[in-house]
């Protein structure tokens, strides 16, 4: 019997009801229990499912095939029949310009003893991998979570199978960059470089753990082992409620050897990466991280003990949908007037530059978004116990129908002199701008805007799988007659820098 690892423990608790488990899940359950299994029927029935031009559905096809090829490899079966399936899948449309897809294809080749095509790993100077699932969209290539983590997981297996030093060096660089997306306690920054539809905190915590689990099996560096130990504890302490993809269970068991415990590695206080316009400061009490790059992602996040602003940035109305949330820009657009200027300070930083609001979503799912040409000049400055966020909106046709939103997580939200809201309730606030306090037991964050001519909406949320796990939405409705905005976010009760 293979020793129980965190994902296996969660997984087996979910597949106890074997009658409702798929044939593939039953096969993996037998493998983990050291029972004999036959994959013939699974291989025979493995087929490409229609994608309707969806990159995400194409990914699911390849991930299902990878689950089969990896399971087949683990039980030392001949890979001839599955190799034929790999060749059939390659004849279907898939984005050959995307290194995410290329590594999926290469891994299936390696596991079925076929010649392994070159992946052509492309990393930014900092070590971040460029992920672009959609074709002809290089300006949107970015280290999005969770695909960046999945890419690192696949790369770990490929390094193990091929023993290539160049791939191992790329993997280590990628892992060191991924540490930028963790706070000082190795907790993932829930919404950093994460689109809302991929923002389930449970699922992403699982992938963070699995990535560092794979990474430490390849290279036992102190910071990676410290990350794995912390993430493993976080996962064990979480009541994981969703179904786990069989592939992740299989990959966890593939790397059975656990690293030796090591001295805890303290992450650097400052986060600094010009290639992703990323800067931040983290301490044991909290973390503030800001960026001007992304694609339908936010401008940053703030954590102070048990209070968080998990994401903030511009978005189109209605507030109920996040398809129109966020900014767009990457290393290709970071030049000239859009060049980000980063300055590190003692226990702080400043970030200045220009970024663009994403295209306004179309009402039809098969049409591209409407280009509104709305730009933001942004200055984000962390000084002592305050983040100053200054924005200037620019656009020939104005910016009506937009808002600037803060997604927060706290025990309660107090609108000064008006009311106090609790998460998950139907009560809400809509009115003039007042000081807004996000409060929990150990800390609070105060949100002020000295001069604002529009209305503010404060809406309690469920705080589970949607909206990056936030339980409050604070939205400032913008109007074209005001272009300059200045928010002040103050840290209180416990000094952020202590």
Regions found by a protein language model. Give the residues of each.
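Extracellular polysaccharide-recognition and catalytic grooves
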Residues: 64-73, 80, 84-276, 281
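Beta-strand-rich recognition/accessory modules
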Residues: 437-498
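Catalytic and substrate-binding regions of extracellular carbohydrate-active enzymes
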Residues: 247-405, 410-411
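Short, solvent-exposed secondary-structure capping/transition elements
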Residues: 36, 164-168, 400
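Short amphipathic alpha-helical segments
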Residues: 1-3, 111, 218, 251-261, ...
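Polar/charged side chains located within well-ordered beta-strands of beta-rich proteins
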Residues: 30, 49, 72, 83, ...
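Extracellular glycan-targeting catalytic surfaces
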Residues: 1-110, 311-313, 350-371
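Polysaccharide-binding surfaces and accessory modules of carbohydrate-active proteins
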Residues: 399-462
């Amino acid at each position: 019997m293979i020793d129980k690892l965190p994902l296996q423990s969660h997984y087996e608790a979910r597949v106890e009801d074997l009658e409702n488990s798929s044939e593939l899940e039953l096969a993996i359950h037998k493998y983990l229990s050291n029972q004999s299994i036959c994959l013939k029927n699974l291989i025979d029935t493995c087929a490409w499912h229609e994608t309707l031009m969806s990159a995400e559905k194409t990914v699911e096809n390849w991930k299902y095939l990878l689950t089969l090829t990896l399971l087949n490899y683990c039980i030392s079966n001949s890979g001839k029949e599955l190799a034929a399936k790999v060749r059939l899948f390659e004849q279907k449309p898939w984005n050959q310009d995307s290194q995410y897809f290329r590594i999926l294809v290469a891994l299936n080749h390696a596991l079925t003893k076929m010649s392994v095509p070159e992946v052509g790993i492309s990393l930014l100077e900092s070590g971040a991998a460029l992920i672009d699932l959609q074709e002809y969209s290089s300006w949107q290539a970015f280290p999005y979570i969770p695909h960046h983590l999945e890419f690192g997981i696949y790369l770990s297996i490929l390094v193990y199978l091929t023993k290539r030093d160049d791939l191992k060096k790329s993997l280590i660089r990628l892992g060191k960059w991924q540490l930028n997306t963790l706070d000082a306690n190795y907790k993932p920054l829930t919404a950093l470089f994460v689109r809302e539809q991929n923002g389930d905190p449970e699922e992403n915590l699982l992938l963070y753990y699995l990535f560092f689990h794979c990474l430490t099996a390849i290279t036992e560096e102190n910071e990676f082992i410290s990350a794995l130990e912390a993430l493993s504890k976080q996962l064990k302490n979480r009541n994981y409620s969703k179904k786990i993809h069989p592939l992740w269970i299989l990959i966890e068991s593939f790397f059975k050897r656990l690293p030796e415990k090591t001295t805890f590695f303290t992450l650097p206080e400052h986060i600094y990466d010009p290639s992703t316009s990323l800067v931040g400061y983290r301490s044991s009490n909290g973390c503030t991280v800001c960026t001007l790059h992304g694609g339908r992602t936010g401008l940053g996040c703030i954590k102070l003990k048990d209070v968080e602003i998990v994401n903030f940035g511009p978005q189109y109305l209605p507030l109920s949908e996040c398809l129109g949330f966020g900014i767009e820009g990457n290393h290709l657009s970071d030049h000239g007037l859009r060049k980000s200027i980063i300055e590190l300070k003692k226990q702080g930083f400043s970030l200045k530059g220009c970024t663009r609001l994403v295209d306004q979503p179309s009402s039809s799912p098969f049409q591209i978004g409407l280009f509104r040409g709305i730009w933001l000049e942004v200055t984000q400055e962390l000084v002592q116990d305050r983040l100053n966020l200054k924005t200037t909106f620019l656009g020939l046709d104005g910016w009506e129908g937009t808002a600037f939103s803060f997604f927060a997580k706290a025990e309660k939200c107090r609108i000064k002199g008006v009311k106090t809201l609790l998460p998950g309730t139907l009560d809400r606030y809509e009115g003039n701008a007042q000081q807004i306090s996000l409060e929990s037991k150990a800390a609070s964050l105060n949100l002020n805007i000295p001069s604002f001519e529009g209305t503010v909406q404060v809406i309690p949320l469920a705080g589970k799988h949607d909206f990056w796990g936030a339980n409050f939405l604070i939205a400032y409705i913008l109007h074209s007659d005001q272009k300059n905005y200045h928010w002040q976010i103050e840290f209180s009760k416990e000094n952020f820098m202590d």
